[in-house]
Amino acid sequence: MIYHKHLLINAKIDMPIKEEQKAVYFLSNLVDSIGMKAIITPVARYVDKPGNRGMTAVVLIETSHIAFHIWDELSPALIQFDLYTCGELELSKVLTVFTETFRPLDLEYVLFDRENGFVKEASGNTRGLHESDL
């Protein structure tokens, strides 16, 4: 069966990833943890442009993509994360790997079912997120 799940995360973090190999590891670990299959090796690059300084990373998966950018000039740093899949998605697994890696100070997420438009399936933030939800 084909699904259309789109997860967006916006989080503030104290210790942003600045090394490309750590960003690649995060994406590889996430892909494995959620039972997806990468169709290319994850790619990460540090962008050293004032106003847009930070890490950008992407991996193509059989069912679409996972990407993020971290703006580390900000304090705390900001990460925008995007996962789209035509496969099943266990939100709790993604949130667990994300929070274990980035230890966000503040986190907001929204999961859309895009089968017939943009139907909000789930949303939350650190103020309402409990370990039992992960």
Located regions from the model:
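Polybasic/polar functional segments that serve as interface/processing modules
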Residues: 1-134
